[in-house]
Amino acid sequence: MTIATAINLENMTTGEAKLTLDKVIKQIAQRENEELLVAHEDIVIIAYALENNLQLRDYLMGLTRDGLSVESVAGILTVMVDLFKSAYRSTYTIETVLASYVYRLGDSAGALVLLANGLARDYSLAKLLLRVFDQGLAPDTFAMMSQGLHGKVVEELTRTQELLANEANR
């Protein structure tokens, strides 16, 4: 007999959330036209973490520094949007991050569409990206800025890995 247990999101650490995020990114990146099987609990954890931890969200903004192409990251995040939807989770965080990669690919119109959900929620990153896009910042410049911050974000995630993922000062 199997007993289902609820995920205790309130007690999840930043380190645990990052491990789950990295695991799912790897699963998506390594699949080759195979059916993707991601645990529902993993999607719930990631959705919660991205809504409650700015460092984890910002970590996604610099994934190209970890050796992935802009196209690959955009593809991974697109799959994650679909996974969030299939798990009935809010998509505004992942769509906003995806908008930054779509912008880097030169599709400003597509990036603006992806920001809509975040802007409707008054999401700070969506508002910041809208200002960046409206100012016409070159995608290459934006990419360099994001990559430049990634090392600092990773350092902060390492430093705070034992803290709760929803720590109040995030």
Task: Show which residues each predicted segment covers.
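Charged, compositionally biased boundary regions
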Residues: 1-169
